[in-house]
């Protein structure tokens, strides 16, 4: 209701307009932006691994043994009047540790590609979910189109019955028709009006559902043009999802290979504490001091070899599962396309006879009207012919809508 007040002039009357409106209205559309933002933030965080990594530490400990002067030296110091106690058993330090990566073997880059690959998979899955929304719009749109045709044909039949009812009323006054004939036609006309009311109610319900689904008022729809049948490459979003999942496994494999390479970096450590790096001085004075160390560090994690082969095998199995899922999808999709192609051919063949059948039914109905006027047949014979003519027109409308829907089903299966 709020959207209707804000956007009262928006109308979606074509199939494509309804589909696009439904996609924009469906809550999952917001996931595209959320996925992109999350992926970008993740990549930025990973990239910051190239920044200097700084940590602050504070430590206090107690040791049962510490570095001490040999006993002979302690005796010598005592003779000299020096009281040297050695290092204290309780030791403390507060420091800072800085590390800068120079070469990581491709670990950071592979993590970045994995993050982007995961984002691509999530976006592709969202596209698949949105594509299913199009199928629901597709079904409601053609159901609404069929109801419009049924309403039109029922209105034509109602007008025809009303015309015959008026003719019988005149004949009743002149004494050439019975009251039973007049009442029979009137009852048939009222039945047609009752059916019209039911069809209108169905249309209003379906129209309301489609409007809510699209997020905009759908007042009227128009029959879509006859499309060209698909003949090119299959563009279903599920295929892109499979490709993204395979690309993610490639990034994961590169990350495994990067774990086998050594890493090189600079490091610097500084702390204020007791004891310091000059143990001899601290053994003599036991005082807090500033200390620092810097250098170049090479790290090679050989334990990654333990699981490397198994992890590679897991990725191969994962690729096989993805390819198997792709083949299953393509197989089922080909079955759907084959069935839809056969439906198009079947409805096209059936529709070729509809025009001829309607022309014959119309001629028979007109002849029945003439016979009734001359008293050759009763009103029941006319009603039978009117119903047969209306049924033939209804079947033609159903065949045309079904054929058109089958064509768009085929395009939908191919995403064209």
Over which residues does each language-model region extend?
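Sec/SRP-type N-terminal targeting helices
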Residues: 30-34, 47, 102-130, 180, ...
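Bacterial Sec-pathway N-terminal export signals of envelope proteins
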Residues: 10-65, 176-178, 214-252, 261, ...
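Small/polar, glycine/serine/threonine/aspartate-rich low-complexity segments that form flexible
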Residues: 57-97, 267-304
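Periplasmic alpha-helical coiled-coil/stalk elements that build and connect Gram-negative outer-membrane
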Residues: 17, 41, 129-240, 245-247, ...
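Short segments within alpha-helical structural elements
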Residues: 188-216, 359-416
């Amino acid at each position: 209701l709020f959207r209707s007040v804000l956007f009262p002039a928006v109308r979606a009357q074509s199939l494509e307009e309804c589909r696009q409106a439904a996609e924009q209205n469906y809550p999952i559309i917001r996931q595209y932006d959320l996925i992109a933002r999350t992926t970008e933030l993740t990549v930025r965080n990973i990239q910051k691994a190239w920044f200097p990594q700084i940590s602050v530490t504070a430590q206090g400990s107690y040791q049962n043994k510490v570095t001490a002067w040999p006993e002979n030296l302690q005796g010598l110091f005592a003779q000299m009047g020096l009281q040297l106690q050695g290092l204290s058993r309780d030791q403390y330090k507060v420091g800072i540790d800085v590390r800068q990566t120079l070469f990581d073997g491709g670990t950071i880059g592979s993590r970045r590609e994995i993050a982007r690959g995961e984002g691509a998979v999530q976006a592709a899955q969202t596209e698949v979910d949105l594509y299913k929304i199009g199928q629901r719009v597709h079904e409601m749109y053609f159901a609404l189109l069929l109801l419009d045709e049924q309403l039109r044909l029922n209105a034509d039949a109602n007008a025809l019955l009303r015309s015959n009812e008026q003719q019988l009323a005149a004949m009743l006054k002149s004494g050439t028709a019975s009251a039973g004939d007049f009442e029979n036609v009137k009852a048939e006309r009222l039945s047609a009006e009752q059916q019209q009311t039911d069809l209108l109610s169905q249309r209003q319900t379906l129209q309301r559902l489609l409007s809510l689904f699209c997020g905009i008022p759908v007042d009227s729809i128009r029959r879509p043009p006859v499309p060209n049948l698909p003949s090119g490459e299959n563009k279903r979003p599920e295929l892109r999802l499979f490709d993204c999942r395979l690309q993610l496994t490639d990034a994961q494999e590169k990350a495994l290979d990067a774990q086998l390479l050594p890493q090189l970096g600079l490091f610097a450590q500084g702390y204020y504490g007791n004891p310091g790096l000059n143990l001899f001085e601290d053994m003599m004075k036991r005082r807090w001091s500033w200390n620092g160390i810097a250098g170049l560090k090479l790290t090679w994690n050989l334990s990654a070899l333990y699981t490397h082969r198994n992890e590679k095998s897991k990725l191969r199995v994962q690729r096989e599962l993805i390819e198997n899922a792709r083949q299953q999808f393509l197989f089922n999709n080909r079955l759907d396309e084959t069935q839809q192609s056969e439906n198009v051919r079947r409805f096209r063949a059936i529709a070729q006879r509809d025009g001829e059948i309607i022309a014959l039914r119309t001629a028979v109905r007109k002849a029945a009207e003439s016979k009734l006027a001359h008293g050759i047949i009763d009103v029941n014979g006319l009603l039978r012919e009117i119903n047969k003519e209306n049924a033939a027109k209804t079947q033609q409308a159903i065949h045309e809508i079904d054929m058109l829907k089958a064509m768009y089903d085929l395009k939908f299966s191919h995403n064209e």
